[in-house]
A protein has these predicted regions:
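TPR-adjacent "capping" and linker segments in tetratricopeptide-repeat scaffold/adaptor proteins
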Residues: 30-32
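Bacterial N-terminal signal peptides
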Residues: 11-21
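Exposed beta-sheet edge and beta->alpha loop/turn motif
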Residues: 103-158
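Short, aromatic-enriched amphipathic alpha-helices that serve as compact interaction elements
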Residues: 35-51, 61, 65
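Bacterial N-terminal signal peptides that target proteins for export
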Residues: 2-12
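Short solvent-exposed beta->alpha transition segments
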Residues: 53-107
Length: 158
């Protein structure tokens, strides 16, 4: 009887672990409940763990919160993935730390100063802009990224 209970509990534990793993792989979708800073945080956290739990998941998550006009300019997704991997943005991939500071906020636009510490211990600063989408449809009133500046190198950490 104890062996049956043991197998039952083992199955429950394994199923729980699989569900946790599956939920961590889930791509978050834009929602009007996600505030502007949280949009940037979602994108940066995803890029910080780009290949977890699968290759380029962080870039795909970042794409999900890109404004449709931004997607038109940088897409399709395969092109966006390649763009993020260029020297201009590669420091965002698997970075070790980031800081997000709000520099401007209005009813429809928010701008943040983002500082990233990359894997080689160099700091970079970006201007990250999100806007509230105002066209009818599933994205109406969602905050979405409209622009990310080129990086400004700030030097190495000690």
């Amino acid at each position: 009887m104890n062996q049956i209970k043991y197998k039952f509990y083992l199955k429950i534990i394994l199923l729980s672990l699989l569900l946790v793993k599956a939920s961590s792989a889930e791509i978050l979708k834009p929602s009007k409940d996600v505030d502007p800073k949280k949009v940037v945080k979602i994108q940066l956290t995803a890029l910080m763990k780009n290949d977890i739990p699968y290759k380029d998941r962080g870039i795909i998550q970042t794409w999900e919160f890109a404004h449709p006009n931004n997607q038109k300019a940088t897409g399709p997704i395969e092109r966006f993935i390649n763009m993020i991997k260029t020297d201009s943005y590669a420091m965002l991939l698997n970075h070790t730390d980031h800081e997000i500071i709000e520099t401007y906020m209005s009813k429809n636009v928010a701008t943040f100063e983002v500082t990233v510490l990359d894997v080689s211990k160099k700091y970079y600063k970006f201007k990250w802009q999100v806007e509230k989408y105002n066209i009818e449809g599933a994205l109406k009133d969602c905050w979405l990224t409209t622009a990310v500046s080129q990086p400004m190198p700030l030097g190495s950490s000690i």
